[in-house]
């Protein structure tokens, strides 16, 4: 049976580090919100059959967007993990795999999705880039304790690609155990799996701080040329 590919976008966060008057996914670049740019990437990728968007119960902005019929809304949770799990629980398709992608990561390119979908190992895979900067470990006083060996360190990105049933079980168990689940792969790791690292691109940035907006606008403009 062929795999069905479904995208889940957790978009219930408030993005406090942006210091903006609205959640960062609703900030506007080039005439569209960050969320719309991100949705456009998934909507235009032929293999993605459906997009599940997890938004806050009291989100006042989502109703202002014109959403494609392929997009299904679900209520987000209080954490990213809960939002993703709510999205997974809305998937009834058999043999489904999920691409979990950050709503505020609008510069993703289809070529990177191609590389993820080439992975058939049920341990799954994530986009990531090797760490190139020197990494320092700090103490509670923000003083350097040691310099880490970066030779085997990677910076995790999204999308993260897993079989729906495996990720659903891993997230559910992790949440019940009170685990610190910072991305989907961390839940998969706790379940005993070893996801593949697929080399991505540094321009697939997550808009987190105000200075990221100009860089995202540059990449989006370049990608449309």
Swiss-Prot record:
What would be an example GO MF term here?
Answer: 2-C-methyl-D-erythritol 4-phosphate cytidylyltransferase activity
Coiled coil spans? none
Q: Which reaction does it catalyse?
A: 2-C-methyl-D-erythritol 4-phosphate + CTP + H(+) = 4-CDP-2-C-methyl-D-erythritol + diphosphate
Q: In which pathway does this enzyme or protein participate?
A: Isoprenoid biosynthesis; isopentenyl diphosphate biosynthesis via DXP pathway; isopentenyl diphosphate from 1-deoxy-D-xylulose 5-phosphate: step 2/6
Taxonomy, superkingdom: Bacteria
- Report the CDD domains cross-referenced here: CDP-ME_synthetase
Entry-linked Pfam families: IspD
Query: For this protein, what is the EC number?
Result: 2.7.7.60
Q: Site Positions MEP for the nucleophilic attack: which residues?
A: 150, 206
User: Which keywords does this Swiss-Prot/TrEMBL entry list?
Assistant: Isoprene biosynthesis, Nucleotidyltransferase, Transferase
The top EC class is: transferase
Q: Point out the annotated site residues (description: Transition state stabilizer).
A: 17, 24
What does the record list as GO biological process? isopentenyl diphosphate biosynthetic process, methylerythritol 4-phosphate pathway
Similarity-based family: Belongs to the IspD/TarI cytidylyltransferase family. IspD subfamily.
Annotated function: Catalyzes the formation of 4-diphosphocytidyl-2-C-methyl-D-erythritol from CTP and 2-C-methyl-D-erythritol 4-phosphate (MEP).
NCBIfam families attached here? ispD
* UniProt protein name: 2-C-methyl-D-erythritol 4-phosphate cytidylyltransferase
């Amino acid at each position: 049976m062929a795999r069905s590919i479904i995208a889940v976008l957790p978009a219930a966060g408030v993005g406090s580090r942006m210091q903006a008057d609205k959640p960062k996914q609703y900030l506007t670049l080039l005439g569209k919100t960050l969320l719309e740019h991100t949705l456009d990437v998934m909507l235009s990728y032929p293999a993605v059959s459906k997009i599940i968007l997890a938004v806050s119960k009291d989100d006042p902005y989502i109703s202002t967007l014109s959403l494609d019929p392929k997009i299904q809304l679900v209520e987000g949770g209080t954490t990213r993990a809960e939002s993703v799990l709510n999205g997974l629980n809305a998937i009834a398709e058999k043999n489904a795999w999920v691409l979990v992608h950050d709503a505020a990561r609008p510069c993703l390119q289809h070529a990177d999705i191609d590389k993820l979908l080439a992975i058939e190992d049920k341990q799954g895979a994530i986009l990531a880039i090797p760490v190139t900067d020197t990494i320092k470990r700090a103490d509670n006083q923000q003083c350097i304790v040691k310099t880490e060996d970066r030779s085997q360190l990677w910076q995790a990105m999204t999308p993260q690609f897993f079989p729906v049933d495996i990720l659903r079980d891993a997230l559910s168990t992790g949440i019940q155990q009170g685990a610190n689940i910072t991305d989907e792969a961390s839940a998969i790791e706790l379940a005993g799996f070893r996801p593949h690292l697929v080399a991505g691109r540094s321009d697939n940035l997550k808009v987190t701080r105000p200075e990221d907006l100009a860089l995202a606008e540059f990449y989006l403009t370049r990608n449309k040329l």
